[in-house]
């Protein structure tokens, strides 16, 4: 069942979901109706990894963008699960232990810090989309 879900979440599916949408891509990928499990932190991280600006409209997302974004979302979710999630504020695992994914974040919560990409070093910017903080690099994400 798990493999079936993973296979069904692919670039064709994401392209179909985003086409003709006038909403920002970040809102689309956080909408649990379309993609389950992508919250605010994971959306910011996946968009950074795929080089997509969070305000970019769904209708402007290309097939190539979808390939990169699907790969990034899967990578972020797998890494987060492996590290026990993100213990920002009060989240803990069932065991009561804190997760460690927040120690590996590229952009989320790093406003003003330099981009992690050596070739860039631009400051990370914080914006608000649908009452949620979003973090991105203005040079790496278009």
Where are these regions (language model features)?
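Basic, nucleic-acid-binding surfaces and adjacent catalytic neighborhoods in DNA/RNA-processing proteins
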Residues: 13-142
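Conserved small/polar residues in nucleotide/adenosyl-binding loops
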Residues: 1-4
């Amino acid at each position: 069942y798990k493999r079936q879900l993973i296979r069904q979440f692919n670039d064709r599916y994401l392209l179909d979901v985003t086409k003709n949408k006038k909403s920002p891509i970040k809102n689309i990928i956080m909408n649990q109706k379309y993609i389950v499990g992508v919250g605010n932190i994971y959306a910011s991280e996946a968009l950074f990894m795929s080089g997509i600006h969070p305000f970019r409209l769904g209708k402007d997302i290309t097939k190539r963008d979808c390939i990169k974004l699907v790969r990034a979302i899967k990578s972020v979710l797998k890494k987060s699960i492996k590290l026990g999630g993100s213990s920002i504020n009060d989240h803990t695992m069932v065991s009561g232990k804190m997760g460690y994914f927040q120690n590996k974040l590229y952009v989320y919560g790093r406003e003003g810090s330099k981009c992690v990409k050596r070739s860039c070093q631009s400051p990370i910017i914080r914006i608000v989309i649908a009452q949620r903080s979003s973090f991105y690099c203005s040079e790496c994400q278009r």
